[in-house]
């Protein structure tokens, strides 16, 4: 079951495209951090898929980060990540409700806002 198809996979693909646009380049210049996002199909900590959202280089990759240490790590269930990425749930609310776990720099985590995702019209 490690090859589970996540709804988040499509969002990450769109994000990869988004970061190559002018709007995406603005995000990269503004934030300049590296985030690790762990997405679990059903339960946090189980069968998680790891994505690296590199807002220094403007890249999204699947798997572990090869460039040292990430600035912050976020863990979500698939459905909760989709809600945050599409603007249906605010990241702060997700954290308060326990739908998102954070490790790493708090100042880096505070820059994890809906602005980094493609606009909902594309989702």
From Swiss-Prot:
Its main location: other. Induction: Accumulates at higher levels in dark-grown seedlings. Induced by sucrose. Gene3D superfamilies: SCP2 sterol-binding domain. Keywords: Lipid transport, Peroxisome, Transport. A motif (Microbody targeting signal) lies at residues 121-123. InterPro entries: SCP2_sterol-bd_dom, SCP2_sterol-bd_dom_sf. Transmembrane segments: none annotated. One of its GO terms (biological process) is response to absence of light. Disruption phenotype: Altered seed morphology and delayed seed germination as well as inhibited root elongation in the dark; an exogenous carbon source is required to recover from the delayed seedling establishment. Reduced levels of glutamine, pyroglutamic acid, aspartate, beta-alanine, fumaric acid, glyceraldehyde and ribose, but increased accumulation of serine, glycine, asparagine, 3-cyanoalanine and 5-methylthiopentanitrile. This is Sterol carrier protein 2. It comes from Arabidopsis thaliana. The gene is SCP2.
